[in-house]
């Protein structure tokens, strides 16, 4: 991959899957509520230190809830017993703590799973007792029947409850649709009721899933359109060449691997084409050295092209446990990474050697995958989603990415197909002691980026095109700036909407707040032109409202006229309307 991304992008998606099912990551059911809160804060502190900007928290692992649901019982993974109130609202707490640390929180939903082991939810569970016809029985589990229209209506209500009551930044589904073990005739009853005569059963099952996705997306747009909707399906799409051609995409022959399309009846390309998701995060869980056609080197470029064709974002999901142990031939590299001599290494037990080598090779594979995600991105929206959060820390990837790949904060990518929200003016910027604070007339979806910028370049829009001076992202209107007190620098604050659109910078100078305006610059819009008055020769930067540089014009001191089409612009940080 060479030097493709020596300087990291200002915008990319950085997240982990935070699993609650079976208490994989969080919470631990043996902990008290206060201990669970403290554990989550520790996780989020670690993610912030690694400069992550999102977390996917599993809040509905098994037709249950890690939030105050109007429809489903409290999850057993909170207290050890299904239906027992944990004494606090985990989702509300998690949103507040994530936003304090500049991270989006997407509520991770498993839509269909009811029980991973038969009868674990009990005979008196509401769904089993009141709607047994909603359940499909498999060899060792039950799922909600994707082919039952009442199930679709119910799931839309469940998710609307979350979207309505909580300030989540997104809803994300995982890879569980029809089960991996395959579906033979378990849904025969639903077929007899709902499958059109002559309809291919595979097409019918895929349409059931497609309808749920479409209905969820429509509900979100109607209820709270600032909430993003994405899915993390199995990484191998698996459709045929004829289906690929009908979608207008390149066919990737992955025969021999599990097919999401024909085994899980999960068609991620269909959702992208229908524009019923905002992002897709296929679980590309095969490492770079995998020689099969579905290895990381093959899947990631293919998904990037598909996402580009459909004008949606692709954030690759990466499995940490497949970042394996090192080989003897690479031991020198291992020792270098561990900072050990060969004698020190030889003094370790076999278990310690295994752990050490796994961590060293894991960082190498992690670095390769991050670089590949960036180099193959075609939307200006690279993304990295690590599974799982516990291993993100235990493998030392948090330290590795902070020191090598995520050395600066990053904003989440702009979703250009969304209508930008109105961004507030930022006023009353002040510093009191160690606290920088400001005011803004904005709702709870708006977040803020804080830059610490050399005063000599603070008024140049190009200064804000990279993350070089980006220090914090927060939903709050104050931060501790005790680490940013160097003389000759100023604070600049921008407002950012849910889709990633960023305002002009508002700069705190010794004389007050200025809206990215150079002293002495006067700029205003007229009929078909932008008019500027400057005290000396100056570069004028004209940007679209979505942040695209349209023109750079060098003007002489005095008055100048710059002809442009009608529209809204940002000129050296000032909003300008041209008729």
Task: Describe each PLM feature range.
Residues 481-502:
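Beta-strand-rich modules
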Residues 19, 23-37, 107, 112-161, ...:
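Active-site-adjacent "subsite" loops/lids of carbohydrate-active enzymes
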Residues 451-457, 485, 512-579:
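C-terminal outer-membrane/trafficking sorting elements
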Residues 447-486:
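Recognizes extended acidic, P/S/T-rich segments that occur
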């Amino acid at each position: 991959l060479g030097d493709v991304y020596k300087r990291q992008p200002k915008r990319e998606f950085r997240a982990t899957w935070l699993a609650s099912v079976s208490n994989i990551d969080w919470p631990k059911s043996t902990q008290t509520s206060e201990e669970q809160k403290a554990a989550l804060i520790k996780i989020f502190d670690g993610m912030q230190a690694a400069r992550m900007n999102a977390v996917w928290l599993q809040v509905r692992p098994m037709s249950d809830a890690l939030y105050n649901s109007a429809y489903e019982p409290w999850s057993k993974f909170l207290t050890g017993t299904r239906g027992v109130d944990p004494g606090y609202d985990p989702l509300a707490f998690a949103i507040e703590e994530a936003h304090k640390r500049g991270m989006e929180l997407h509520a991770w939903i498993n839509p269909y799973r009811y029980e991973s082991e038969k009868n674990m939810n009990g005979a008196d569970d509401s769904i089993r007792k009141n709607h047994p016809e909603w359940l499909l029985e498999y060899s060792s589990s039950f799922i909600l029947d994707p082919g039952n229209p009442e199930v679709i209506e119910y799931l839309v209500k469940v998710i609307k409850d979350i979207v309505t009551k909580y300030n989540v930044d997104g809803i994300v589904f995982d890879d569980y649709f029809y089960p991996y073990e395959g579906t033979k005739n378990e849904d025969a009853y639903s077929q007899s009721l709902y499958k059109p005569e002559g309809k291919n059963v595979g097409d019918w099952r895929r349409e059931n899933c497609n309808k749920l996705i479409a209905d969820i997306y429509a509900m979100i747009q109607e209820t709270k359109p600032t909430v993003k909707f994405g899915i993390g399906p199995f990484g191998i799409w698996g459709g045929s060449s004829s289906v690929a051609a009908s979608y207008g995409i390149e066919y990737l022959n992955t025969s021999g691997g599990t097919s999401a399309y024909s085994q899980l009846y999960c068609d991620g390309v269909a959702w992208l084409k229908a524009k019923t998701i905002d992002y897709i995060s296929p679980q590309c869980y095969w490492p770079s050295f995998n020689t099969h056609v579905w290895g990381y080197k093959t899947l990631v470029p293919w998904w990037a092209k598909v996402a580009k064709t459909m004008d949606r974002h692709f954030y690759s999901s990466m499995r940490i446990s497949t970042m394996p142990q090192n080989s003897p031939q690479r031991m020198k590299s291992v020792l270098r990474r561990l900072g050990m001599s060969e004698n020190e290494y030889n003094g370790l037990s076999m278990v310690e050697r295994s752990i050490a080598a796994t961590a060293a090779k894991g960082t190498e594979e992690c670095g390769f995958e991050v670089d590949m995600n960036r180099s193959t991105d075609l939307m200006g929206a690279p993304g990295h989603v690590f599974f799982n959060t516990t291993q993100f820390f235990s493998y030392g990837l948090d330290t590795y990415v902070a020191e090598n790949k995520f050395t600066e904060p990053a904003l989440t990518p702009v979703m250009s197909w969304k209508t930008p929200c109105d961004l507030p003016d930022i006023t009353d910027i002040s510093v009191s002691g160690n606290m920088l604070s400001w005011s803004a007339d904005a709702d709870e979806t708006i977040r803020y980026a804080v830059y610490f910028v050399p005063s000599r370049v603070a008024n140049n829009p190009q200064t804000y095109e990279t993350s070089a001076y980006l220090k914090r992202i927060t939903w709050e209107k104050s931060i501790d700036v005790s680490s940013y007190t160097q003389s000759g620098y100023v604070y600049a604050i921008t407002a950012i909407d849910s889709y990633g659109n960023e305002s002009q910078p508002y700069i705190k100078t010794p004389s007050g707040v200025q809206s990215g305006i150079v002293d002495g610059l006067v700029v205003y819009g007229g009929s078909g032109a932008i008019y500027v008055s400057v005290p000396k020769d100056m570069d004028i930067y004209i940007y679209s409202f979505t942040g695209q540089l349209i023109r750079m014009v060098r003007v002489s001191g005095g008055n100048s006229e710059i002809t442009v089409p009608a529209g809204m612009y940002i000129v050296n940080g000032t909003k300008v309307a041209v008729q």
